[in-house]
Amino acid sequence: MKSAISLLLASAATYVGASPHPEPPQLVLSPSTSTGVHGDEATSAIASSAADDVISDSPFLSFHRDLVQISSISGHERKAGDFVAEFLQAHNFTVVKQPVPSKDGRQPDEDRFNVFAYPSGASAAPKILLTSHIDTVPPFIPYSAARVDNDIRISGRGSVDAKGSVAAQVFAALDILERDPSAPLGLLFVVDEEVGGTGMKVFSDSSLNPSPSPFRAVIFGEPTDLALVSGHKGMLGFELVATGQAAHSGYPWLGHSAVSALLPALLRVDRLGDIPAQEGGLPSSPKYGRTTVNIGRMEGGVAANVVPASAHANVAVRLAAGTPDEARDIVRRAVRDATGGDENVYPDFSEWSEGYPPQDLDTDVDGFEVTTVNYGTDVPNLRIHERADGAPVRRYLYGPGSIHVAHGDHEAITVAQLEEALQGYRKLIEAAM
């Protein structure tokens, strides 16, 4: 679905021959050979029991319920962190609560922390790390469960993104450890993934992520519709800024409209994903398709009867190829060409100075559908150090639920998806051991 801003610009673009933004199909690289875990027995149990009874009778589903019932909007994750930490301690894990400051370095109003855990008596440097995040986007949506045909649909904020992954990772680890108490597993549940990745960055820069790396594999949990993800697009953000001179709207020649100055640059930037790279556009790739541009917010002026002295727009770019620095150069040239070199219109990258290129991930475990995704994750926020033996550290991205409902008013997941994710995480752990 196009944004209202892109539709507005597209209307203007009909006069200059701009192309629309076609919706690219999501690339599926290989079909699944997994049969899942929801067979006749599970279907029969669900069909004959009330939803609440099924959930209450399952430690796994009860853990997921209790976690979703805790509001943990980014910046306010403490209660969820305490819940996860206390549960793991009660199940014979050593738990480290790693403090995470706010992005500007000041501690937020409510203390928050990452939860890092490993089996008591085992090494604090596990070979296999399962990780996801406990923060959610706003607003909080209460937990609910209802029978739907032969399944149970669980609704609530975080039920998909990413408390479904958290619950499945915890119980996959418990299942593996019950069979093999010496399994070299670790769990990491971070804060702030939804608003900047500060939690993972703090872990990445800490002694808990040593060099050489102890990790043989890192398994990231996000809603992937139970597919194993071979990679996701990169990310670049910036603000497009224009400055002008205020004046009475009855005498516009006495001022200079920042909004009018901004529009040609916006139109050009909005099309950069559709323009071939050889013609000055942003690059595409066979794996990830087109680079996409979203102008998410515009603001300018103070009143309709005042020539606006300032205007700006926030832009998010999902990179299909290349590096953030290369994309910044393309954006700068596009703005310069669109404005005739007007120095009062420029892209400001200072607020989003990092960015990252496309992230290629491992898919060497059989039994999964393989796909790519367009959303961002904490994958680039975890620096992977070289191992002492020179072997590569495998990175997997997998989880239950659909990203298409993850941030919406109807975020929901099914019991069948959660149970299949439990099996999927076990399979990934066993392959990495």
Swiss-Prot record:
GO terms for molecular function: metal ion binding; peptidase activity. Residues 20-40 are annotated as: Disordered. Keywords: Glycoprotein, Hydrolase, Metal-binding, Protease, Secreted, Signal, Zinc. Zn(2+) 2 binds at residue 161. Gene3D superfamilies: 3.30.70.360, Zn peptidases (3.40.630.10). Glycans are attached at residue 92. Belongs to the peptidase M20A family. This is Probable carboxypeptidase ATEG_02905. It comes from Aspergillus terreus (strain NIH 2624 / FGSC A1156).
